[in-house]
């Protein structure tokens, strides 16, 4: 087992208790094999609505549906035994009212086995977060760049510079006070991210924020080089699996066209092989 491997699955209360301690490791997953690969090394595996873009070729996360989240959530759940699974609430499934949010969150958790839900928004979503937590649904909050709000934010811009910094600080304090067990800070300035981390009593999970956050998360297809439509500044590529995969497919195509594949070791003889009678 790798030196980074863990032994037991954390609960939301365990994640919250990690505030100021060992950094929390998080990645997104959308399939069973990928979940199995990261299970021993991640504290949190997020079934992110980013699946709409990286798996389904959609232009944004806005087109992602509950049915898509449930399908992929079930797949990821089957691949996990150690990491805690958190699932994104898709656009339109929680914004209308706390009651709508509860119905959607309960369905997501019931049908996927997720340990918590993640929703976007700060002060304006605090009432909804509190409503969910009071009814037994753990919530990971998400502030800063919130991809479901790109049409009102004006695109994928850094959030929290200038006067907006105080707004984000108040967002963080509001979701913490409402009962969120952690909060994602996306594409927020380093200094502000550190100030928020020091100002609230729940872990901050950074993505394009600061190494000083209580944990980090990346989209797995970004860090493995599988999603190549664009590369965000905050992404570190730990592998170039897209290039490796393309090269492997090209080699396979060449072998098929040259009749090198299947080779003798890949096919079956007409007669049954003789049993080995040697003792």
UniProtKB/Swiss-Prot annotation:
One GO CC term on file: cytoplasm
Q: CDD domains, alphabetically? A: KPHMT-like (cd06557)
Cofactor: bound how, per the entry note?
Answer: Binds 1 Mg(2+) ion per subunit.
Q: Name one GO biological process term.
A: pantothenate biosynthetic process
Keyword tags: Cytoplasm, Magnesium, Metal-binding, Pantothenate biosynthesis, Transferase
Q: Where is the active site?
A: 186
Q: Does the keyword Transferase apply?
A: yes
Q: Which residues participate in Mg(2+) binding?
A: 49, 88, 120
Catalyzed chemical reaction(s): 3-methyl-2-oxobutanoate + (6R)-5,10-methylene-5,6,7,8-tetrahydrofolate + H2O = 2-dehydropantoate + (6S)-5,6,7,8-tetrahydrofolate
Among InterPro entries, the record links this protein to: Pantoate_hydroxy_MeTrfase, Pyrv/PenolPyrv_kinase-like_dom, Pyrv_kinase-like_dom_sf
A Gene Ontology molecular function term of the record:
magnesium ion binding
In which residues is 3-methyl-2-oxobutanoate bound?
49-50, 88, 118
Q: In which pathway does it act?
A: Cofactor biosynthesis; (R)-pantothenate biosynthesis; (R)-pantoate from 3-methyl-2-oxobutanoate: step 1/2
Name the Enzyme Commission number(s) assigned to this protein: 2.1.2.11
Could you tell me where this protein is found in the cell? Cytoplasm
What domain of life is recorded for the organism?
Answer: Bacteria
Cofactor(s) needed, names only, are: Mg(2+)
Complexes and interactors = Homodecamer; pentamer of dimers.
The entry sums up its family as follows: Belongs to the PanB family.
Q: What does this protein do?
A: Catalyzes the reversible reaction in which hydroxymethyl group from 5,10-methylenetetrahydrofolate is transferred onto alpha-ketoisovalerate to form ketopantoate.
The cross-references to NCBIfam families, in alphabetical order and at most eight, read: panB, PRK00311.1
Q: What is this protein called?
A: 3-methyl-2-oxobutanoate hydroxymethyltransferase
Q: What is the lineage of its organism?
A: Bacteria, Pseudomonadati, Pseudomonadota, Alphaproteobacteria, Rhodobacterales
Gene encoding the protein: panB
């Amino acid at each position: 087992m790798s030196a980074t491997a863990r032994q037991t699955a954390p609960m939301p209360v365990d994640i919250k208790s990690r505030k100021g301690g060992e950094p929390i490791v998080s990645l997104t997953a959308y399939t069973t094999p990928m979940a199995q690969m990261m299970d021993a090394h991640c504290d949190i595996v997020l079934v992110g609505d980013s699946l709409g873009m990286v798996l389904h070729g959609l232009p944004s996360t806005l087109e992602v549906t509950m049915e898509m989240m449930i399908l992929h959530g079930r797949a990821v759940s089957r691949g996990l035994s150690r990491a805690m699974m958190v699932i994104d609430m898709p656009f339109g499934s929680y914004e209308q009212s706390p009651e709508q949010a509860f119905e959607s969150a309960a369905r997501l958790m019931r049908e996927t086995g997720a340990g918590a839900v993640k929703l976007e928004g700060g002060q304006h979503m605090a009432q909804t977060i509190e409503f969910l937590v009071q009814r037994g649904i753990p919530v990971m909050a998400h502030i800063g760049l919130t991809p479901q709000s790109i049409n009102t934010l004006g695109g994928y811009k850094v959030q929290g510079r200038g006067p907006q910094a105080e707004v984000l600080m108040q967002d963080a304090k509001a979701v913490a006070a409402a009962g969120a067990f952690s909060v994602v800070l996306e594409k927020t300035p380093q200094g502000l991210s550190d100030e928020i981390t020091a100002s609230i009593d729940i872990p901050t999970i950074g993505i394009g924020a600061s190494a000083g956050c209580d944990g980090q998360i990346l989209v797995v297809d970004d860090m493995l080089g599988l999603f190549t439509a664009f590369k965000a500044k905050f992404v570190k590529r730990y592998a170039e699996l897209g290039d490796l995969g393309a090269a492997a497919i090209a080699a396979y195509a060449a072998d098929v066209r040259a009749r090198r594949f299947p080779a003798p070791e890949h096919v079956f003889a007409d007669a049954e092989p003789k049993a080995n009678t040697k003792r």
